[in-house]
C-alpha cells in the first residue's frame, strides 16, 4: 500500500494509524518525487550464475494505476535505451555479485536532474511482459545459463 503525506506531521499521523491498526513490521519512507507517470522507468535485468549482467531492458512507463491499492503498478510501457542509466545499474548489480532477475522502479527527478531508484525487486516485475515484447525471452536466459551453459555476448 502507498500512502502520501503533505508534511512531516501528516506522515506521523499516518504512521501512528498504521501501527495502531496492528501492523507490526517496519515502514519505508521515501521522498515524493514530483512528476507524472511519464517520468517513470522500469528496468529488468538478468544476472548469470557468475554475477555478470546478461540482459537489461529499460521500459518507459506511459501510464500507471491510480487506484488506492494499484498505485505504482505500471499499465503501459514502451522500451527505450538510456545506456548511461543502464550502465549504472549494471555496475551496481555486478559489484554485489547479484544472481537472477532484478527489477527496478526508477523516476526522473526534475528538481536536480537525477534518476531515483525506489526499489529493487529480486524477481521479474509484475509488468515484465514488456521485456518479452521487446524480444528478450525471459526463460531463455535461465536455460542458456544453467542448462546449456552458453557463452554470452550481451543484450541491452
Regions found by a protein language model. Give the residues of each.
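A short glycine-rich, hydrophobically flanked beta-strand micro-motif that places a catalytic Asp/Glu
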Residues: 30-31, 99-111
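ATP-dependent carboxylate/phosphate-activation module, predominantly the ATP-grasp catalytic core
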Residues: 2, 6-9, 13-19, 31-97, ...
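Peripheral (often C-terminal) accessory segments that flank ATP-dependent C-N-forming ligase machineries
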Residues: 144-156
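Glycine-biased flexible loop/turn sites that connect beta-strands or occur in inter-domain linkers
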Residues: 51, 112-113
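Short, structured loop/turn "capping" segments at alpha-beta junctions
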Residues: 25-26, 99-100, 152-153
Amino acid at each position: 500500500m502507498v500512502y502520501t503525506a503533505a508534511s512531516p506531521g501528516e506522515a506521523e499521523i499516518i504512521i501512528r494509524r498504521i501501527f495502531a491498526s496492528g501492523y507490526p513490521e517496519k515502514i519505508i519512507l521515501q521522498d515524493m518525487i514530483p512528476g507524472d507517470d511519464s517520468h517513470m522507468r522500469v528496468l529488468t535485468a538478468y544476472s548469470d550464475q557468475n554475477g555478470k549482467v546478461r540482459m537489461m531492458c529499460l521500459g518507459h512507463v506511459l501510464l500507471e494505476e491510480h487506484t488506492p491499492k494499484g498505485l505504482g503498478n505500471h499499465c503501459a510501457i514502451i522500451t527505450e535505451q538510456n545506456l548511461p542509466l543502464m550502465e549504472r545499474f549494471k555496475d551496481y548489480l555486478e559489484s554485489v555479485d547479484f544472481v537472477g532477475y532484478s527489477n527496478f522502479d526508477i523516476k526522473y527527478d526534475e528538481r536536480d536532474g537525477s534518476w531515483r531508484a525506489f526499489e529493487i525487486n529480486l524477481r521479474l516485475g509484475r509488468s515484465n511482459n514488456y521485456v518479452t515484447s521487446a524480444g528478450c525471452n525471459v526463460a531463455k536466459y535461465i536455460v542458456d545459463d544453467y542448462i546449456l551453459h552458453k557463452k554470452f555476448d550481451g543484450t541491452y
